[in-house]
Amino acid sequence: MAVLLFSLLVPGLTIAQTEVLYNGIHLPEQWPPRYGEPQKAQDMPVPYLRQKPEVISVNVGRQLFVDSFLIAETNLERIIHTPRFYERNPVLGPDKEWEKTTEGGLYAAPFSDGIWYDEKDQKFKMWYLAGAGVLHKGDNQTFYTGYAESKDGKHWTKPTLDIWDQTNIVDTCNRDAATIWLDKQERDPYKRYKMFNVERRPTDRRWQFVLKYSSDGIHWGEGVAQSGDLYDRSSVFYNPFRDVWALSMRYGTNVSSRSRSYLENKDPEEAVSFAHRIRKGVPDKNIVYWFTPSDKEPRHPEFPEVDPGIYNFDAIAYESVMLGLYSVWQGPENGVCAKLGIQKKNEIFLGYSRDGFHFYRPSFKPFMAVNETDGAWNWGNMQSINGVPLVVGDSLYFYSSGRQKNEIMWDSYTSTGLATLRRDGFVSMHGDKGGYLLTENLSFDGKYLFVNADVKGSLFVEVLDANGNPLEGFTQKECIPVKKTDKTKQLITWKKHQDIASLIGKTIRLKFYLDNADIYAFWISPWQTGESRGYTSGGGPGLSASGIDVPANQ
């Protein structure tokens, strides 16, 4: 296990608790933390699971059971769920001449980029990497940025635009990865869309971040900030819980050349300007080592000698957590792929964080797996996408890129696919007869208690005080049971109480009793309509344009 090197790296530093997060977690004075680089693959430490807050605030968002943070005691079984692929995938593919490379490679899929729902325009919007052989002819493999839109997230069109040659290309810079962020908290309309483009630097052909702004996601201004040179597969995310922009950068360690480093700043322009490659043995003021692959990563069955790596890592706020999307590389190396005419194996895995830095991974099975069937759109090299998931009714829409096995060029033929999951449906706690779950001490300022649950038998909720004593009027016997109901938003009431407003200001515990039921989440809302005040990731139809789950008219 990594040891936090406060005293070694910052002499005289004390770990006085300073910043307190929305959920009660205290951050140490040294932030982001500086860990020593390990010599072997290992899991990232998650300090807040070892030392929880005395009282956890549940004011923000639906509370998910993706880790043990909320749980004091339970006999329930944790079940990990994965999404179902849309039967008509891919939803977007390379069908234009201007999406080919000079050697005919086909590309039409995000490489992080972004898929968002814009509540103001009431459209699904996608930015993606396209082959740029008709413009950048100096190399076999060059790329620029295309744009597509949809009314339902399943049927996409590529509009004719006035940017480049009456196509759907919105940025012509020679690029690799990119992050397009629809910043719903941005007050300056000109900066509502942010592009963090990993572009070729003309002078020495190295990669660097260039930050650009747009008011509509189509017409982009000139760059306003640039980084030093970087490794290609780097990305950016916004952590709204702490109001910081974080750079997730490829980084080499003794464990793997596919590890990650981290940089954060409240100003996206400064974040980009501080980014650069790290020289070994010299500490950097802003950039810290982040994590390596885990020793639990799956290995390629055909190439078991290949040590897995983290090809990319994206993240986004969903409800009360930061959702981490890992593109886990399992090999083989490019030279072997080219010789065999196959795609490298990248699959998408999930992790969850409550402080935006330490991510817990409850499963090392793919969340979105490749399909090594001839003709499959996702035979190999699946990559995560920014903005994902989108909230569409009771479902979450997860998009990813995939690459088809082909005879044109081994690394080409990218397209975009969709998979759907129940809202909050990452993890459920399942109970048969006599099942229960007792939370840690909670504080709240809402009024109405809701659950997301699939109840084939029954579910009761009891409210207890901080000492574990059931509160009169809120006992299990007084609870109106939920029976044979499957809802992503179910109000909990008691015989004499329609809400728990009378308990505001008290420290409470919740005890859930399950009989043949699964519970995915609970939350306490100010509104009887059940909005959670959590973050809605890439957004969705009927949601608030603020990116926060509040009544749409607020």
Protein language model features and the residues they cover:
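Bacterial N-terminal signal peptides
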Residues: 2-12
